[in-house]
Amino acid sequence: MNKYPLLSLINSPDDLRLLSKDKLPQLCQELRSYLLESVSQSSGHLASGLGTVELTVALHYVFKTPFDQLLWDVGHQAYPHKILTGRRDKMSTIRQKGGLHPFPWREESEFDVLSVGHSSTSISAGLGIAIAAQKENLGRKTICVIGDGAITAGMAFEALNHAGSVHTDMLVILNDNEMSISENVGALNNHLARLLSGSIYSTLRESGKKILSGLPPIKEFVKKTEEHVKGFVSPVGTLFEQLGFNYIGPIDGHNIHELISTLKNMQSLSGPQFLHIKTKKGKGYAPAEKDPIGFHGVPKFDHKLGELPKSSTTPTYSQIFGSWLCEIAAQDEKLIGITPAMREGSGMVEFSQQFPQQYFDVAIAEQHAVTFAAGLAIAGYKPVVAIYSTFLQRAYDQLIHDVAIQNLPVLFAIDRAGIVGADGQTHQGAFDLSFMRCIPNLVIMTPSNENECRQMLYTGYKCGKPAAVRYPRGNAIGVKLEPLAELPLGKSKLIRQGKNIAILNFGTLLSEATKVAEDLDATVVDMRFVKPLDTQRIQEIAQTHSLIVTLEENAIQGGAGSAVAETLYQQQQKVSLLQLGLPDNFIPQGTQKEMLAELKLNAEGIFEQIKQFLQKI
C-alpha cells in the first residue's frame, strides 16, 4: 500500500472525513488506481466504478454513513464504495467463491443498506427507508444513486412519482455516464447548480410562493422566472420537477469540490431532491474510456497493456443464438429480435448491425419487451425475445397475460439459465423452468449442446405458439452443427441404453450424465422438452428400470424433475425416483465449475448422490 499513502489510511468513512478538502483529489486518484489494479487481478466490474470515484468520496465525506442511508442501484458502480467502507484489503476476493459479493450486500457490511443486482430498485426501497426515518423522526438522510440506464425502467418512474407525491425527504442522484440525457455540463451549470441547491435560493423560492400565492399575475411571473433560471441548467429537469422533485444539475461528476459543495447545500433541503451529475464511464483509464462496454465486466488482464484476453475458440451459447438469429433473419424479414438492454451479453451485436430494421433494444424494460413482442406477433411478425433467465422473472405477468393466454407465437431465447457463476444470488438462472412449467400453451425446451440449441430455436420459431429455449452462460462443447430442422414436439432422444437405472437429462449436464452412466451401466435419455413432456418415454422407462434419476440445472421444486414425478404418479408407476438439481436456497457466487461441484451436479457428485440413494432403497 506504499503506492497509496492516503487510501491506506482510510478504513472507514470516519477516516475519510478527517481529511482536508485539498487532499481529496489525491485520494480520488489513488482510489481509481487501486480499483484498476485490484479488478485487473481478480476480474469484475471495472468501467462503472472508475466513473463513480469522485461521487463516492463526496457522498461519504458529506453524509454520515452508515447513519445516513446510501443506496446504490444495481451495484456495478459500488466498488469504490466497498473500498472506502472497510473492504479494501479483500477486494482481491470479489466475485470469487467465499469472497466479497459482486454487488452491495446487506449481510456483508452495515454500509450496504440494500442488497442489489437487478436494476431500478433503489428509489422504491429508498422511499420506504426515508418514510420510516421520517416517522421515527431520526433526522436520517436517504440517498439513492441510480444510473441513466436504470432510471429508464418503469419501476424507477413509479417510485419517483410516488416520492414526489408524498414529499418525503430524500435525495436521488442520477449518475449520467453515457451522454444519453443531456450534454449541458460546464462552469455555468456548476455555478447555477450551487446557486439553486443553496438554502438562500430554496428559502426565497418557497417563501415567495407562499407570499405571492394570492397574486396570480406575480405568482405566474415568479414561476416563469424560476423555470427560465432552471432552463439554463437542463431542460430535462422539467420532467423531474413535474414529478415533484427539486431538480439540480447537471454538474460535473468528476469535480470533487463542486460535488461536495452541491451535496452540502442539498443536505439541508427538505422534500424530494434530484441531483443530475455527468460522469465518464471508465474515467481515468484510456482503454475503458474508449470501450466502456468492453471494460464493463472484465476477466483478469494486464492493465498496463490495456488489452483484454481473447476468449475461447469455442463459441458461447450466446454467440450460437446470435448466428442463428442472423441466419433466419436473412431468410425472413418478419423476424424481429428484441433485447432489454443486453445486446452484447445476448450475442446480438452482429444481428443489430446486419439487420438494424429487424432489431429493437427496448432498454431496461423487460415487461415492455414481452408485451411489445406480443403486439408484433398479433400483427403477423415473428418476435424473438432474447433475455436472461433472471430478468425474465421481471416480466412474468406479461408472459402469462399478454403472450400465453393469447397463444401468440413469441419465441423466448433464455440466456444464462442455470448456474451463472461470479454474479451470485441475484443472477443465477435457477427458477425459469419452475415458473414457466405451469403456464398453459407454452413449449419449453432444454438443449444439451449447441446443435440442439439451434434446432430448438428453429423449432420454437416454426411451432406457431409461445416457446422458450433455455441455455447456459459460457462456451458450447464443440459438436458439429447440423442443418436446421424442426424437432417433433415433446419427443425425447435415447442417448445410451443401460439397465436398472435411467437418467433423464434436461439441459447441458448431459455430458456429466453420460460419464456417470458408463460407470453404472445406466440408461441415459436426453428429454429435450420440459413441456410437452415425453410421457410415453417415461412410462417405458418406469416399466423397465428400478430407479429413475432426473437431472436439471434448475430448482428442484417445481422443475423438470417435478414434472416427471407428477407423470409417474398419474401413471401409477411403481419406481424409485431421485431428483437432482438446485437446492432450496439462493446459490452464492463462485465459478460455474466450483458451484456445480459443490452442488454435486458434476459427474462425481451425481455418481455419489445416486450411490447414496441406492443404499436407502
UniProtKB/Swiss-Prot annotation:
Keyword flag Metal-binding = yes
Source organism, top-level taxon? Bacteria
Select a single GO molecular function from the record's annotations and give it: magnesium ion binding
From the UniProt record, list the reaction(s) this protein catalyses: D-glyceraldehyde 3-phosphate + pyruvate + H(+) = 1-deoxy-D-xylulose 5-phosphate + CO2
Record-annotated membrane-spanning stretches: none
Kindly list the positions annotated as binding Mg(2+): 148, 177
Q: How is the cofactor bound?
A: Binds 1 Mg(2+) ion per subunit. Binds 1 thiamine pyrophosphate per subunit.
InterPro entries cross-referenced by the UniProt entry? Dxylulose-5-P_synthase, THDP-binding, Transketo_C/PFOR_II, Transketolase-like_Pyr-bd, Transketolase_BS, Transketolase_C, Transketolase_CS
Which cofactors, by name?
A: Mg(2+); thiamine diphosphate
Which PROSITE patterns would you find in this protein's record?
TRANSKETOLASE_1, TRANSKETOLASE_2
Q: Which family does it belong to?
A: Belongs to the transketolase family. DXPS subfamily.
Q: Which HAMAP family match?
A: DXP_synth
The annotated subunit structure for this chain is:
Homodimer.
User: Which NCBIfam families is this protein grouped with?
Assistant: dxs (TIGR00204), PRK05444.2-2 (NF003933)
Protein name per its UniProtKB record: 1-deoxy-D-xylulose-5-phosphate synthase
Q: Which gene encodes it?
A: dxs
